[in-house]
Amino acid sequence: MIRGIKELKPKIFLFENVEGILSGKWDKKEGKKGEIFRDVWKGFSSIRGYTAQPTLLHAYGFGVPQNRPRVMIMGIRNDILKKSNLKPVKFDPSRENTTFSSQIKNNGGFFPKWDENEIDAPDLIDVLSDLDFTGWSSEKPFYKKKARTDFQKFLRENNITNEKGKEILTDHEFSNHKDHVVKRFKFMLDNNITKKSDLPVDMQTKKFNQKPVPAKWKIKPTITVTSLPDDYV
């Protein structure tokens, strides 16, 4: 990426990675925490003709219904920066890596800031409660329910209707699970099963990765689930 920036000289570049990069090390045994981000920062901040700044943003701060922190580095070409009112916030990579997060979280500068006291990110109920469970291995190409929340109404703005006047819904389909899998999923949801040992013997499998994820959390927003499609129910 750095080679590409030097060659193409874009007005702005943006690097993005997971929060774990702040404590990452090149070698698990002999490496030092934070060395990966120090090297990444050194590479981007030393590109001639650019001014760079890192930040740690949370998607929930901007109304996105999930807890998804991301480390970003933005670089602005100096001739473009001079024409703007933007001012970078300083970052000190020589300090302990344990300070990296506090140094750059919601730090403004090149990036937008959110108000920690006014976070109003929706949860899964707010976002998806207008969708029907139509049954395994099925698909409904239109909404059967009316939008209930402001977020759902926002998602349906300028929505297209079919010949019967119903709002078109795409990609709302369910996997074609076998009966014993459907039975296990239902048991897990009804009984909040999180461990293999809590399942009846006839439902236990050699590999058990499935975990029920609540649709509504005590503290918003909802966690981000990243997995193979069948790992969560």
What are these regions (language model features)?
Residues 2-207, 211:
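Class I S-adenosyl-L-methionine
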Residues 211-233:
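A glycine-rich dinucleotide-binding beta-alpha-beta segment and adjacent secondary-structure elements
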